[in-house]
Design a protein with these regions (language model features):
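N-terminal secretory signal peptides that target proteins for export/translocation
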Residues: 1-2
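N-terminal mature-domain "stem" immediately C-terminal to a signal peptide or N-terminal signal-anchor/transmembrane
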Residues: 23-57
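Low-complexity, glycine/alanine/valine/leucine- and proline-rich hydrophobic stretches
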Residues: 295-296
Length: 400
């Protein structure tokens, strides 16, 4: 029986390793094909050989192409985590630290310091989180496997050109699984089009040069249509029985037209008497906060095509400039948590014996599974969501 068990185990190892062997062979063949195209993409054979010789595929990134989120984040959770007291304080410190650079950036590109720093804060938490996946590994894998190979081949060759031109050292090029990197998370192709050398050292470096990263971000927004004489928008109040059929950031009317329909700023004051086009944004429906948004909001949307993302950047920028929190509450009886509160939830889960790793404020799969169990034990809906209700229940249970 022992011999049979060993044989079965060996067969299992062979079966498990066969796909990996096949992947390695496919990858090697794919790299040879890519090498034959390199010169036409502006990449020398020497550069290609030097930086691909030791590459092995990371098949995990292929799975991300079609991965469906197991947990859809409500906007009140998204905003609570991205625009919290911690990020506002850190952002204001960065405004002070980089004031001279930001003033020059605004003069040259017409994008205010608060907006640039808000992008920085959301994209990498002010340089604390670039992403840990080596770009050449991820992009070469995605160039050879899965959907969108043509797109990722372009990003792969562009990454090699970035290295070849001496902008960023290859070992410093780590980022997201899809290839975004640096302080403000540019894709390689975006880097080539829009990154600038703002510190004057002859390199465009979004990893080790904060001035280059901030100026490149402003250049992106300017090219996306940002106007320095215009707000991104602001929170508004709608009159009762307001017809929201025409809501949407693309369905723009002038401020005068919105005013004629009874729309006011959230403090009750009248809208600007201007012909400025603006769309009505209702990110949580008619029961939640409402905003009039201008072309500058569209420029933020161009940075990352999600309205919740653009709103987080816009609101964080307002808070960095001394603005107040949103006035209208989100339509929920279980509001979202700041990162500090998320870490507290994780600490309380650890105290109850759940092995979820160090508290980091990131609500991942292990934290959600632990939350489901605890929610069931505490009489809450076991959905794995980290909100104020489960935080209160955990605090109460801890104090008993």
């Amino acid at each position: 029986m022992r011999a049979l068990g060993g044989a079965l185990a060996l067969l299992g190892m062979v079966a498990l390793s066969a796909p990996a062997i096949a992947s390695d062979r496919e990858f090697a063949a794919c790299l040879q094909q890519l090498r034959s195209e390199a010169a036409t993409k502006g990449v020398s054979s020497a550069t290609f050989d030097q930086h691909t010789a030791a590459l092995v595929p990371d098949m995990a990134v292929v799975g991300f192409l079609d991965a469906q989120p197991e947990f859809v984040t409500p906007i009140w959770d998204y905003m609570a985590g991205l625009v919290d007291a911690e990020r506002v304080a850190d952002g204001r410190a960065m405004l002070e630290r980089w004031a001279e650079v930001l003033a020059r950036v605004e003069t040259q590109y017409g994008v205010d310091a608060g907006t640039v720093v808000a992008v920085w804060g959301v994209e990498s938490n002010f340089g604390r989180n670039f992403g840990s996946r080596p770009l050449l590994t991820s992009l070469s894998t995605l160039s050879c496997f899965g959907r969108r190979q043509a797109f990722f081949r372009g990003e792969f060759f562009t990454t090699l050109k970035i290295i070849q031109e001496g902008h960023v050292a290859p070992e410093r090029l780590t980022g997201s699984w899809a290839g975004a990197f640096g302080h403000t998370q540019f894709m390689p192709s975006t880097f080539m089009r829009l990154a600038v050398d703002f510190d004057g050292d002859g390199r465009r470096d979004l990893v080790d040069s904060v001035p280059d990263a901030l100026a490149s971000t402003a250049n992106f927004l300017k090219r996306a249509g940002w106007r320095g004489d215009l707000d991104w928008g602001f929170e508004v109040v709608l009159p009762k029985r307001f017809d929201t059929a025409g809501a949407g950031r693309r369905n723009k009317q002038t401020m005068q037209q919105w005013a004629s329909r009874g729309v006011k700023r959230v403090d009750g004051s009248a809208l600007p008497a201007a012909a400025t086009p603006a769309g009505l944004l209702l990110p949580a429906g008619a029961a939640g906060p409402a905003f009039l948004v201008t072309r500058n909001f569209d420029a933020l949307y161009a940075y990352n095509a999600a309205e919740s993302y653009a709103l987080a950047i816009a609101h964080l920028a307002d808070r960095l400039r001394g603005g107040a929190p949103l006035v209208t509450p989100w339509p929920t009886d279980d509001a979202g948590l700041s990162r500090a509160e998320r870490r507290e939830v994780q600490s309380l889960l650890l105290a109850r014996g759940h092995d979820i790793g160090e508290p980091d404020g990131m609500i991942g799969a292990r934290t959600r599974e632990a939350l489901k169990q605890v929610q069931g034990e505490l009489g809450l809906v076991a959905d794995g969501r980290a909100g104020q209700a489960v935080l209160k229940a955990l605090r109460d249970a801890e104090s008993r």
